[in-house]
C-alpha cells in the first residue's frame, strides 16, 4: 500500500492523503481522489489529469516549498504550471509503473513519504464544486476581471506552453505577422557531416514493459547531445548551451505599444558562456543566438509555441535570433523574423530532416557577426541547405503602426459601471453575471445561444 499526498491545482486547501495499492492503476487513483472530494470535484473521475509533483532535481515537492504553499492558497506557482503542462500520468499504468519510470522508488531512495506533495490534480474548467456562494462569486468576479482587461483595456496574455492553434493565430493576427515556408536543399551525397539522431532513452519497468522517458526526464541527456554536435563552434565563439525550462519565466515581455504580454520560457538557449560561469547572468540573455524547443513528438500545433517564444526573445534582445522546434531526430524546424512586406511582418519557416544538416545550419548561424550594419534594417546571411541568402530583420522594425482601438460601446460602459459599483460596495454576483452574459452575447459564436 502506498500513501500519496495529493493537491488539487487552483483549489485552496490542504493536500489530502490517498491510500492505494501499488498494483492499482492511475485510473483507480483518479476514482479515489474523486471519492475523497465529492463537493469539490463534479466531473467524471476519468476527466481528471494527474501529474507527479517534483522539484527541478527530480525529488518530491516538499510541503514547505513556496510552490506547495501557493497550492494551499489556491494559487498556481510557475513551477507547478510547468509540471502540469508536462507529462501526465497514464490511466492504464499501475502506480508502481509510474514510480519506477520516474525513479521514485524505495530502491532509489525516493519512496513517497510524509511532508511531501506527490500528485497534482487538475480538474477540468467548470467542474469545480463550491462549498459556498462566496467561492462562486470569487470565480465569477475573476472572469469579469479578465473580461475587463481584454474588452476595456484591450489586454491579452499568451503563455508560450499553453498557446493553442487558435490563440497562436490570434497572436499573429494581433501583430499582423504572416508565416511563410522557405524551401531547403539537402546536401549532395558525401557532403556535410553525418550525425546520428538522438535516441530517446527507454526503461524497462517492473512488468517488463518498455517505456520511453519523457522530455522532462531526459533534459540533461539531450542538452549534452546538442553540445556534443556543436562543441567546436561553442568554444571558438565563447558560447554555451543551457537549459531554462524550469524556474524564472525568462521569455516574458510586453509587446511595445500594445496591451499584449508574452510569458514563459523554452527548453534550451545558446548564448554567451558567461552564463556558464555566472548562472544568474542568464536573466540578461547575453549574446543569445537562438532558442531550442524540444518535443519528443513534434505536432503541427507546436509551431505556435515556438513562434510565441521567438517573438518574445526577439523583442527582448538587440540582435536577430532564431528559434528551433525539434524532436532531435527527423524534425528540425527553424523560424526567424525575415522582412516586412507592405504592413505585415514576415516570419520565415524552414524544415530539415537530417540531424547532420541541421547542425551544419546551427554551426553556420553561430559564427555570424552579432549586429546588423548601422545603415540598413535588414541583413542577409548564407546558411547551408538554403538556396538563397537568409534575410533577417528585428521584429520591432517590422511591427505595424499602432492603430486606434475599436469602440465596444455598451460592453465597455457595463464593465466600467460594474467596477465603479464594486469599488464602493464590493463585488455583486448578480451584476457580474449580467455583465458576463452581455460580453458573451457580443461574441458572434456565442450570440446564437444567448
Curated annotation (Swiss-Prot):
Residues 18-55 are annotated as: LQLFLAK domain. It is found in: Secreted; Host nucleus, Host nucleoplasm. Glycans are attached at residues 103, 342. Induction: Expression is constitutively high and slightly induced during the late infection stages (approximately 1.5-fold). Residues 1-17 form the signal peptide. Disruption phenotype: Leads to a reduction of virulence on soybean. A motif (Nuclear localization signal (NLS)) lies at residues 218-224. One of its GO terms (cellular component) is extracellular region. Residues 125-450 are annotated as: Effector domain. The keyword NADP does not apply. Belongs to the Crinkler effector family. The CRN proteins have modular architectures that include a signal peptide, a conserved N-terminus, and highly diverse C-terminal domains. The conserved CRN N-terminus harbors a distinct LXLFLAK motif, which is followed by the conserved DWL domain. A highly conserved HVLVXXP motif marks the end of the CRN N-terminal domains and forms a junction where diverse C-terminal domains are fused. The conserved CRN N-terminus mediates the translocation into the plant host cells. The C-terminal effector region is sufficient for its activity within the host cell. This is Crinkler effector protein 63.
Amino acid at each position: 500500500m502506498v500513501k500519496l499526498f495529493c493537491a488539487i491545482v487552483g483549489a485552496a486547501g490542504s493536500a489530502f492523503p490517498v491510500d492505494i495499492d501499488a498494483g492499482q492503476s492511475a485510473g483507480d487513483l483518479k476514482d479515489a481522489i474523486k471519492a475523497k472530494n465529492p463537493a469539490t470535484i463534479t466531473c467524471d473521475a476519468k476527466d481528471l489529469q494527474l501529474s507527479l509533483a517534483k522539484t527541478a532535481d527530480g525529488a518530491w515537492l516538499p510541503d514547505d516549498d513556496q510552490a506547495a504553499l501557493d497550492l494551499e492558497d489556491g494559487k498556481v506557482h510557475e513551477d507547478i504550471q510547468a509540471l502540469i503542462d508536462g507529462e501526465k500520468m497514464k490511466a492504464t499504468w499501475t502506480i508502481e509503473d509510474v514510480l519506477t519510470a520516474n525513479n521514485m522508488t524505495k530502491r532509489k531512495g525516493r519512496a513517497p513519504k510524509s511532508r511531501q506533495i506527490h500528485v497534482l490534480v487538475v480538474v477540468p474548467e467548470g467542474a469545480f464544486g463550491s462549498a459556498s456562494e462566496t467561492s462562486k462569486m470569487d470565480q465569477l468576479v475573476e472572469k469579469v476581471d479578465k473580461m475587463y482587461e481584454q474588452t476595456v483595456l484591450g489586454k491579452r496574455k499568451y503563455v508560450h506552453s499553453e498557446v493553442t492553434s487558435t490563440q497562436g493565430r490570434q497572436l499573429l493576427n494581433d501583430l499582423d505577422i504572416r508565416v511563410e515556408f522557405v524551401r531547403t536543399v539537402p546536401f549532395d551525397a558525401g557532403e556535410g557531416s553525418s550525425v546520428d539522431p538522438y535516441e530517446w532513452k527507454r526503461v524497462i519497468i517492473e512488468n517488463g514493459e518498455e517505456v520511453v522517458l519523457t522530455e522532462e526526464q531526459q533534459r540533461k541527456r539531450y542538452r549534452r547531445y546538442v553540445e556534443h554536435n556543436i562543441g567546436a563552434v561553442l568554444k571558438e565563439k565563447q558560447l554555451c548551451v543551457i537549459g531554462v525550462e524550469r524556474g524564472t519565466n525568462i521569455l516574458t515581455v510586453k509587446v511595445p505599444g500594445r496591451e499584449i504580454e508574452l510569458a514563459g520560457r523554452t527548453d534550451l538557449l545558446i548564448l554567451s558562456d558567461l552564463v556558464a560561469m555566472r548562472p544568474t547572468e542568464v536573466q540578461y540573455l547575453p549574446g543569445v543566438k537562438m532558442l531550442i524547443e524540444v518535443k519528443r513528438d513534434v505536432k503541427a500545433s507546436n509551431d505556435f509555441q515556438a513562434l510565441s517564444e521567438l517573438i518574445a526573445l526577439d523583442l527582448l534582445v538587440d540582435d536577430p535570433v532564431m528559434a528551433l522546434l525539434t524532436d532531435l531526430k527527423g524534425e528540425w524546424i527553424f523560424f526567424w523574423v525575415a522582412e516586412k512586406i507592405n504592413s505585415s511582418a514576415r516570419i520565415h519557416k524552414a524544415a530539415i530532416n537530417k540531424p547532420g544538416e541541421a547542425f551544419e545550419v546551427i554551426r553556420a548561424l553561430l559564427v555570424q557577426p552579432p549586429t546588423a550594419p548601422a545603415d540598413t534594417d535588414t541583413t542577409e546571411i548564407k546558411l547551408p541547405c538554403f538556396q538563397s541568402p537568409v534575410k533577417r530583420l528585428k521584429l520591432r522594425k517590422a511591427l505595424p503602426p499602432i492603430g486606434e482601438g475599436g469602440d465596444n460601446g455598451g460592453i465597455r460602459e457595463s464593465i466600467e459601471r460594474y467596477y465603479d459599483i464594486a469599488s464602493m460596495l464590493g463585488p455583486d454576483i448578480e451584476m457580474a453575471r449580467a455583465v458576463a452574459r452581455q460580453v458573451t452575447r457580443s461574441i458572434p459564436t456565442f450570440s446564437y445561444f444567448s
